[in-house]
Amino acid sequence: MTSLRFDLANVGFAEGERYERARPGYPPGAIAALCAACGITPGRTVLDLAAGTGKLTRELVACGAQVMAVEPVAGMREQLAAGLPGIQIVQGTAERIGLDDASVDVVMVGQAFHWFDGPAALQEIHRVLVPGGAIGLVWNVMDRRVGWVERVQELIHRHRGPNPWYAGHAWRAAFTAQCGFAELQHRVVTNAQPVDVAGLIDRVASISFIATLPDEERSVLMNEVRHIVAEELPGQARFAIPYVTDIFWSHRMG
């Protein structure tokens, strides 16, 4: 992660409590598919890289794996430690993981690879993986095929600027024939997050570049989100945010 990206993430994701509250978990089908593809079984050593508040970490622990977590943002590490006091948590980044060579069987990354310096991160992931070890990537993405979601996403996109984002797919450029990993595989699982208006507002506010907006600008944006809900979902106290969960995996070569 470049210093500029780290600074943005460190500020934008500082409110670990909001992130934990607002972001959805991963659907069981996505976790099962990733565990099968990456060979995650009881006793295997798995690194959750850029673990955040531990949403993916908890799923990996439930699979019976020996899980450790690397996370650069202090607020995220605090939430992670509170929820999973028994696991090893290391302050580090994807480009400087801080573990020994060939020390883990699988590296998992949830909602984060697009933040990394891709080539440098893959080189470091290659280093800490055992020969033939696996990398798994997962993202929960709001389903823009739904009309009201598309309107909310357009509002969000106005404020994105040069910030890294998954849907732009620039992150995939790191997976070249020379990157040390086999061809990236992909699968899609659908998901939904039940919320009320306050929950949707929290979800939007948990986005790094939204969290760093000036208070007045952020307040205007949130009122626009409320207006969309009132227009598109009239009278619905609770509703579901539809998601597409994208999972990717590959294996270390050499």
Q: What is each PLM-predicted segment?
A:
Residues 43-44, 102:
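Nucleotide donor/acceptor-binding cores
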Residues 45-47, 53-96:
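Class I SAM-dependent methyltransferase SAM/SAH-binding core
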Residues 109-110, 118:
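A short beta-strand submotif of the Rossmann-like class I SAM-dependent methyltransferase core
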Residues 116-124:
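A short, conserved alpha-helix within the catalytic core of class I
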Residues 173-254:
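Conserved Class I S-adenosyl-L-methionine
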Residues 95-106:
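A short acidic, Gly/Pro-enriched loop at the edge of an enzyme's catalytic core
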Residues 1-41, 55:
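Conserved class I S-adenosyl-L-methionine
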